[in-house]
């Protein structure tokens, strides 16, 4: 079990487990919400009803101070992390990192990982491997698969 008590869902969890999340208000009440995930959900939604739902979630989490939004430092540190992954640079704690061809595609996941770590939240995702790459730079990052979380 993760050491952090609070959690946030990656965008793919909202897609895969939409009905469970919508029908379990306690989940939403106990979690933090990433503005990056909110952006991904809003930008890809087709339904006006879903967009209204996301707006309500945004307001609730903003009011509850559980909406995690990257600041200028997060953007800068994330850019450096992606650069290191892309070029296979050394990390402070893990030495050389393997070069990635798709590092630029990981920007949103990196922002989610960084803000979750700073807020002491674990990330629930289907893309454990993508998030695992960031642990060389975010040693306190905790990642939980959807199977582990939902059983």
Model segments located where?
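Short, hinge-like loop/turn segments at secondary-structure boundaries
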Residues: 48-53, 85-86, 141-143
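Short acidic-hydrophobic, aromatic-tinged amphipathic segments that line or gate anion-handling sites
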Residues: 65-73, 142-148
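Active-site neighborhoods of divalent-metal-dependent phosphate/nucleic-acid chemistry enzymes
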Residues: 67-129
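Alpha-helical elements of the RecA-like P-loop NTPase motor core of helicases
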Residues: 16, 43, 76, 132-133
């Amino acid at each position: 079990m993760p050491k952090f008590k609070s959690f946030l869902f990656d965008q793919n969890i909202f897609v895969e487990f939409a009905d469970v999340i919508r029908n379990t208000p306690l989940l939403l009440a106990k979690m933090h919400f990433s503005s990056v995930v909110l952006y991904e959900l809003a930008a890809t939604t087709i339904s006006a009803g879903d967009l209204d739902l996301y707006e309500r979630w945004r307001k609730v989490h903003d009011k509850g101070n559980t909406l995690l939004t990257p600041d200028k430092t997060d953007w800068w540190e994330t850019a450096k992390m992606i650069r290191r992954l892309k070029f296979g640079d050394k990390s402070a704690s893990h030495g050389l990192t393997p070069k990635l061809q798709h590092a630029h595609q990981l920007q949103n996941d990196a922002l989610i990982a960084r803000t979750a770590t700073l807020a002491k939240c674990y990330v629930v995702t289907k893309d454990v491997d993508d998030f695992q790459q960031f642990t060389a730079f975010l040693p306190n990052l905790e990642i939980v698969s959807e199977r582990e979380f939902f059983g």
